[in-house]
Amino acid sequence: MILKKFLLLAVSGTAMLPAYSKGYISYDESFKSNGMDIRFSSNQCNAFLEKLYECKNTFIKILPIKQTLKLHTAWINLDYAVYNGKLDDKYADDKYSIVFSDVNGDGVNDLIIQTGKKGAYGGPSYNIYLYRKGKFIYNRPLSQLTIGTNSLFRVNGNILTVGKTSGCCEYNKFTYKLHNDAVKLVRKETEVCESSSEKC
């Protein structure tokens, strides 16, 4: 079933959301977040969960810089579409579809978009775009850090940390240093934990 397009306007975290519907939809959504005007549009979205959609042939238009990103696949969570803030310990894992945050410690927000579910246990994976010379530029090494990991990495300056579970009881914490848009592993910590632990 094809549904007609709708418009979602989100301002300062407040949104009027469309009701859940089964089948495919054409999704055309506009919102504002701390001065960033964004438009998300796709002609083929399919409900993965009640309020989580997988969208093919997606266009994300960033109006202030007049840039449009074309993605084969992007995911949109109707309740948690966009986050603008730090990727620290207070960040809520696995919720937000679009994230504006300073990833490389240069004081300027970069862009993170959920494009898959290649994280640990089918969790989200992302495309990372660093802001350079007035545009968001895709960064493959950073994007690869979101595959197979327990959550999106945490950022402290140019230091990134991310966790990955191996089997039932081994938890690995990786620390990377970001320099010239490339990542270098500087530390790996491993601990054995109980299967009931949040880490495992």
Q: Each predicted region: which residue ranges?
A:
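Sec-dependent N-terminal signal peptides
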Residues: L3-T14
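Acidic, small-residue rich beta-repeat scaffolds with periodic aromatic anchors
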Residues: P18-K66, N150-C200
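Structural signature of eukaryotic scaffold interfaces centered on beta-propeller domains
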Residues: S30, S97-G105, F153-R154
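Beta-propeller blade repeat segments, especially FG-GAP/WD-type strand-to-loop junctions
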Residues: I62-K66, Y121-P141, F174-N180
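Beta-propeller fold detector
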Residues: H72-W75, Y138-S143, L185-E191
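Repeat-based blade/solenoid architectures
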Residues: N77-Y96, Q144-L152, S196-S197
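Acidic/hydrophobic-patterned starts of short beta strands in beta-sheet-rich repeat architectures
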Residues: N104-T115, N158-T161
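Short glycine/serine/proline-enriched coil/turn segments at secondary-structure junctions
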Residues: K118-G122, G167-C168
